[in-house]
Every structure is written in C-alpha cells, then in structure tokens.
C-alpha cells in the first residue's frame, strides 16, 4: 500500500486531471482488493475519505482488522460501502456473523456505513458488477454530520 500511496497516486494526480485532496479520493476493490480497500481507508484516512469493499476477505485476519478499526485515526465524513454474497462460501452463518461483527465495529467509530448481504450473490466479477449501482450511490452521496 505504501507504493500505491507514495508513488502511484502522485503519478496519477500529476499526469491526469484529478482532484487529489482527501475529499475526492476514493478506493475500492473486491475480495482481497476489498480487504485492501478497507485497510487503506483505515490506515490512510488522511488520503482516502471513502471506500468500497465488495466481498472483502475479512476472514483472513479478523482480529488484526478489528484492532485497526479500533485505533484508526478517522476524519469526520468517512464513508464505507461493504457487502458480500449469500452464496459466497460454504459457511454462510460464519461469514454472516463475521461480517456483522465487522460492521458493528466500524459503526462504533462513526464511519458512515452502507452494508449489504446480497441475496444469491457469489464471489465473482459477475456478482460484483451487479452491486456497482449500490456502491456508487453510497460513495457519491453527501454526508450529513
């Protein structure tokens, strides 16, 4: 993530017409990319104001992620869209419980969260594509503090 923050983003901001400030800098991804997007929002909240984490692999290290949520230095107006599909893994009950715990933890920090369990959703690009309208709606709406 350091390379992304210190090399890639400055390159993009220098070579393309962007609004490089935090308020206009979002990140998103699916699966491990969803986990990295959640991590980036928490660890680099001075860079990213909003993130989309589609089917984030929070099961990889839930304790470390929960700790990061608890200690992250978050600015007001931080927004997160997070979802997963009901048909993603064999242990839906465990996934649902872990997802709910992460959502609860995020909400305690004042993050504006939109979370969804997608009925019939799978761990696939075809399923994630169908979530784009929900994701963009969340990332683009005005936040009322």
PLM features per residue range, with description:
Residues 1-145:
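Non-catalytic cap/lid and distal C-terminal segments of serine-dependent acyl enzymes
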């Amino acid at each position: 993530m350091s390379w992304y923050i210190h090399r890639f983003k400055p390159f993009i901001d220098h070579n393309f017409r962007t609004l490089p400030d935090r308020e206009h800098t979002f990140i998103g991804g699916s699966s491990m990319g969803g986990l990295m997007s959640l991590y980036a929002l928490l660890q680099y909240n001075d860079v990213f104001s909003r993130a989309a984490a589609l089917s984030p692999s929070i099961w990889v290290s839930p304790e470390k992620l929960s700790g990061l949520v608890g200690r992250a230095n978050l600015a007001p107006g931080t927004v997160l869209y997070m979802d997963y599909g009901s048909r993603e893994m064999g242990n839906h009950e465990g996934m649902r419980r872990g997802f709910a715990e992460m959502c609860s933890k995020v909400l305690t920090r004042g993050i504006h969260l939109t979370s969804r369990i997608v009925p019939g959703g799978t761990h696939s690009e075809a399923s994630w594509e169908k979530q784009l309208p929900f994701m963009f709606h969340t990332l683009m709406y005005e936040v009322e503090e």
